[in-house]
């Protein structure tokens, strides 16, 4: 690897520390603010230089699109499980821009292992102990069997429900009698299974 200038080394150290502390790389604006640059564009030029030297990879289209590369990946702690926030229409649920933060939770605590966390909103699943504000541990998968509790995307809405398929129609059942099932006709509606619910962390109390 080609040697770094003092400023490049400073930026690389900032990126490493930010990932270690928050699980995410800094934005260009955050780099500029912390290191006293006049604009985010100045930070971008240094990032391009670091990418040319093989220290990082730049992923276009996202403000935190910075990834450590090569030898810089060594000694970096596992960031943990990503907590998924608001999911944009048409984007993969694990896209970096959907990640609010990372939690130090061992994926192997769950069977099958967890790939991400999703914050529960509402009480449609309260009768099986999935409550508003809980963190739902989810195993990434794209198929489900009848009776499984899944994270599903119907059109552009993400929901947690019990899965039932009858022919070309899927019913997503709540575990709360106040909520009617969601009926999805696969002939003319979009349904994506994002994962299987494998555990609950109650209101994030022990994170």
Swiss-Prot record:
One of the record's GO molecular function terms: serine-type endopeptidase activity
InterPro entries: LexA (IPR006200), LexA-like (IPR039418), LexA/Signal_pep-like_sf (IPR036286), LexA_DNA-bd_dom (IPR006199), LexA_repressor (IPR050077), Peptidase_S24_LexA (IPR006197), Peptidase_S24_S26A/B/C (IPR015927), WH-like_DNA-bd_sf (IPR036388)
DNA-binding region extent: 28-48
TM spans (from-to): none
Active-site annotation: 124, 161
Swiss-Prot/TrEMBL GO biological process terms: DNA repair; DNA replication; negative regulation of DNA-templated transcription; proteolysis; SOS response
Keyword DNA repair appears in the UniProt entry: yes
Pfam family, one: LexA_DNA_bind
Site (Cleavage) location in chain: 89-90
Catalytic reaction annotation: Hydrolysis of Ala-|-Gly bond in repressor LexA
EC number from the UniProt entry: 3.4.21.88
Keywords: Autocatalytic cleavage, DNA damage, DNA repair, DNA replication, DNA-binding, Hydrolase, Repressor, SOS response, Transcription, Transcription regulation
NCBIfam families xrefs: lexA (TIGR00498)
Similarity annotation: Belongs to the peptidase S24 family.
Task performed by this protein: Represses a number of genes involved in the response to DNA damage (SOS response), including recA and lexA. In the presence of single-stranded DNA, RecA interacts with LexA causing an autocatalytic cleavage which disrupts the DNA-binding part of LexA, leading to derepression of the SOS regulon and eventually DNA repair.
Classification via HAMAP family: LexA
Subunit structure, as described in the record: Homodimer.
Name of the protein described by the UniProt record: LexA repressor
Source species: Shewanella amazonensis (strain ATCC BAA-1098 / SB2B)
């Amino acid at each position: 690897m080609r040697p770094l200038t003092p400023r490049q080394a400073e930026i690389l150290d900032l990126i490493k520390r930010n990932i270690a502390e928050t699980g995410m790389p800094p934005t260009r604006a955050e780099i500029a603010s912390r290191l006293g640059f006049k604009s985010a564009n100045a930070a971008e030029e240094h990032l391009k230089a670091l990418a040319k030297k093989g220290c990082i990879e730049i992923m276009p289209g996202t403000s935190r699109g910075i990834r450590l590369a090569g030898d810089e990946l060594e000694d970096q702690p596992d960031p943990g499980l990503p907590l998924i926030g608001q999911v944009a229409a048409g984007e993969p649920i694990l896209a970096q821009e959907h990640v609010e933060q990372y939690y130090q939770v061992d994926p192997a605590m769950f069977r099958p292992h967890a790939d991400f966390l999703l914050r529960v909103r509402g009480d449609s699943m309260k009768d099986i102990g999935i409550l508003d504000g809980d963190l739902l541990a989810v195993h990434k998968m794209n198929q489900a069997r009848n009776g499984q509790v899944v994270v599903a995307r119907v059109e552009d809405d993400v929901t947690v429900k019990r899965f039932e398929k009858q022919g070309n129609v899927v019913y997503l059942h709540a575990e709360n009698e106040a909520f009617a099932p969601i009926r999805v006709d696969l002939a003319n509606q979009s349904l994506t299974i994002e994962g299987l619910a494998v555990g609950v962390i109650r209101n994030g109390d022990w994170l």
